[in-house]
Amino acid sequence: MPNTFNSTLKTFTLALGLVLLLAGCKQNSSEAAFDNYHQRLTNVLDIDPTPVPNTNVLPLPQKRDLNQALPDIRIGLLDAYELRQCGLFQLIAERNSILGKVQDKTRSLQYELLFLNGLSYCLTQLKPDSDLVAELTPIYQQKQQQLPMIFWNMIFTGEEWRKQLTLGHELVDSEKNSEFLTSLSAFSYVADLVNNNVTTTPAPIAPTLIEKKYQDLLHHQQQIYNSRYLGDLFYSLARTTTWLNAITAQLNANQDLILCGNNMNQQKAKYLRNVFYKFYVADIQRYLAHLDSQYQQIQPVLQQIHQQLSQAPIQVTPDMQGYIDAYINGEAYRQFHQATLDHVKFWQRLFKQCNFKVGQ
């Protein structure tokens, strides 16, 4: 019996190890494609591959460095009771409860949006000369001024949204397009919320009719909970830039080894051309186009959010400004695009020098 158990355990362990190995290979397939391309080029040139340096990325700063401190402006239950005709009493009672005081950043934003709408609605329903209007008006104005900071805190310190923007450590899987679409949908929804509530002031709606208006915010929060796709996309831009720059530099440094011209043996150049088509065009170029397309879709959304929120007096640390410049304003993408162009230019020169026709 012990022998049977040990045999079964060994079989299970080996099977588990194989599964993990295969999973690891699949996760790193894009990195492996660059490594394979690099290795084959150096094999043709008969040189040692230059070690590819580590990729230095700008991390998302810690929560404590990003959180915007806000004074807690509340209406007491006594005053709130007078607002029952506006439908605000239940909302304020829930906020003042124990559970209301420990809301996550997304639910806090949802509450503030509902509360602002309720206040605005009340101000249209109460008599203009009432004491309550005089009390509520400055509260409404202060809350409206705080709204950009509340959005900022949700995006950069809220667990689910922050996870999306935290840089990963491996290249994205180009087959996981659904994760990207989920992230794009979530941040596009937030961009619309910012535009409709910060950039402009929406017309108030009766609280009983608006209850479900911001449920989609919680839906998107749930959808992105287990994903960090955008952070992986940002890392992928930086990592592929490192790869391309390293490979291009080595090709340029060894160009004298590639003979082309009349009465010359162009065999090495032809082998390089084969590597270019088989491994760069077929795999690498397609992957680079995938990254390019996804970033160009998400970047305008993130930039729109940032530009609209930056109209408010938000305190941004130098480290955060570096992160914003790199991944939201597009500096990392600019470097990625330049690295791609530099690599393609090497091949254009080689094809011209060796009189190779494109596609042959």
Role assignments for model-derived ranges:
Residues 28-54, 223-360:
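A cross-kingdom marker for long, charged
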Residues 30-183:
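N-terminal Sec/ER secretory leader and immediately downstream segment
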Residues 2-13:
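Bacterial N-terminal signal peptides that target proteins for export
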Residues 21-24:
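C-terminal motif of bacterial Sec signal peptides marking the signal peptidase cleavage site
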Residues 15, 141-142, 151, 332-339:
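Alpha-helical interaction segments
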Residues 139-252:
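Extended, low-hydrophobicity segments enriched in charged/polar residues
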Residues 10, 26, 63, 101, ...:
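Context-gated lysine
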